[in-house]
């Protein structure tokens, strides 16, 4: 099995869907390793725009089988709603090519209610979650009281565990705007149609052990990783290389490439430190030109300059073999473009390669920038590297050098499926 892993290198929304879509055309199997319907990928394919949340993007390729892995949390209503939306847009037979590991956990409507209550209790210290129930679901998993997807098929077991969860949350929060009987009733219907999608992950993957091309699609990004991200302003799963290996039982020696996806600038949704954020006309312009609104929440994304410190840190943890730089065209009309190259910590320490673990310290760092000239010309839809303006090529090559020579093999130059330069 030759495995390619695609990972977000910043705070998510880097545009992982397009490279995943492109690579899935040659893949036999596409797997999601972690996260849930809090993730969001947009793929423009012909005249259709597809929004993916819990489903793997490999569904667009008619020859690619797709697995939602053991490290994920699955909101069953969203799973079926998303499948129906894809089939309505012409992806006929998609439902026959997607499977769920029986060890994945069930994200309930109950978890979404609890998510809102937990955020409300934090007041001004909100994490800024998507409100989808991801955190409470992973909390139940860690506390060993969660419900696994395979347990949905055992009606008595499922109902007993769900009632126990509801009872525990009522003891904690008091009255809940939630009716456990309604959720139980909905799952009576899901149970009838979910069975064919549920698989023993290890046995399933064994069938593909000789596959020359397996694609692993990362969700969220390294800076949202539970261990390595800007804790506590993170998601509740392991979003990096280690999480993918663990969740899908990958043999590390089978990994042929690790692709880090980086936006040509930096964005973040929700709360938390963001050293290179631009709360000025530059940030507003990036937001407007880049149409920076979250696929999952619709929230306005915070915008800032490219941060080499953050990306060096990400590279050190995820060990990228190549990069996909996205949305280069958004920078077309800037006279000058800044790149963050170092942080000055509150105590005066200068760092180029790592970030402080303390979110409050990270929030107070000063960023040291270099300024590069813009190219002030259109790169939208450019297909060849040599056709890019000289200053655009200089920008890309500066990033490559700043990340120790990791090659930028793919460059996104627009929203369409084929708006991609391949430097193979």
From Swiss-Prot:
It catalyses: IMP + L-aspartate + GTP = N(6)-(1,2-dicarboxyethyl)-AMP + GDP + phosphate + 2 H(+). Gene3D superfamilies: Adenylosuccinate Synthetase, subunit A, domain 1 (3.40.440.10), Adenylosuccinate Synthetase, subunit A, domain 2 (1.10.300.10), Adenylosuccinate Synthetase, subunit A, domain 3 (3.90.170.10). CDD domains: AdSS. One of its GO terms (cellular component) is cytoplasm. Substrate binds at residues 295-301. InterPro entries: Adenylosuccin_syn_GTP-bd, Adenylosuccin_syn_Lys_AS, Adenylosuccinate_synth_dom1, Adenylosuccinate_synth_dom2, Adenylosuccinate_synth_dom3, Adenylosuccinate_synthetase, P-loop_NTPase. GO terms for molecular function: adenylosuccinate synthase activity; AMP binding; GMP binding; GTP binding; magnesium ion binding. It is found in: Cytoplasm. Mg(2+) binds at residues 13, 40. IMP binds at residues 13-16, 38-41, 130, 144, 220, 235, 299. Its EC number is 6.3.4.4. The active site is at 13 (proton acceptor), 41 (proton donor). Pathway: Purine metabolism; AMP biosynthesis via de novo pathway; AMP from IMP: step 1/2. GO terms for biological process: 'de novo' AMP biosynthetic process; cellular response to cadmium ion; IMP metabolic process. Binds 1 Mg(2+) ion per subunit. Keywords: Cytoplasm, GTP-binding, Ligase, Magnesium, Metal-binding, Nucleotide-binding, Purine biosynthesis. GTP binds at residues 12-18, 40-42, 301, 327-329, 412-414. SUPFAM superfamilies: P-loop containing nucleoside triphosphate hydrolases. Its main location: cytoplasm. Its cofactor is Mg(2+). Belongs to the adenylosuccinate synthetase family. NCBIfam families: PRK01117.1, purA. Plays an important role in the de novo pathway and in the salvage pathway of purine nucleotide biosynthesis. Catalyzes the first committed step in the biosynthesis of AMP from IMP. Homodimer. This is Adenylosuccinate synthetase.
